[in-house]
Amino acid sequence: MALMITDECINCDVCEPECPNGAISQGDETYVIEPSLCTECVGHYETSQCVEVCPVDCIIKDPSHEETEDELRAKYERITGEG
């Protein structure tokens, strides 16, 4: 399942540099996560780094992009060319 940033985002910019896949960018009003690039840090880290650093806990699982651990790993391999 990809992650998403809720409208509670305060645009503090701490999440964007933490994403190893470059999935986070500045949107019109808040930061956004590109679901096709978000692996919840599977393949890179044990936990989602953006969630760890967010000071307002506004990064949650995106219910419209449900994925299994295997699907996230396959996405990681596709993005990085590893596997």
From Swiss-Prot:
Record-linked InterPro entries: 4Fe4S_Fe-S-bd (IPR017896), 4Fe4S_Fe_S_CS (IPR017900), PSI_iron-sulfur_center (IPR050157), YfhL-like (IPR047927)
Binding positions for [4Fe-4S] cluster 2 per the UniProt entry: C19, C38, C41, C50
GO CC terms in record: cytoplasm
PROSITE patterns tied to this protein: 4FE4S_FER_1, 4FE4S_FER_2
Cited Pfam families: Fer4_7
GO molecular function: 4 iron, 4 sulfur cluster binding; metal ion binding
Effect of V14G: Increases the reduction potential of cluster 1 by approximately 50 mV
Cofactor note: Binds 2 [4Fe-4S] clusters.
Cofactor(s) required for function per UniProt: [4Fe-4S] cluster
Taxonomy, superkingdom: Bacteria
Residues covered by the 4Fe-4S ferredoxin-type domain: 2-29, 31-64
Function: Ferredoxins are iron-sulfur proteins that transfer electrons in a wide variety of metabolic reactions.
Protein's UniProt name: Ferredoxin
Organism: Allochromatium vinosum (strain ATCC 17899 / DSM 180 / NBRC 103801 / NCIMB 10441 / D)
UniProt gene name: fdx
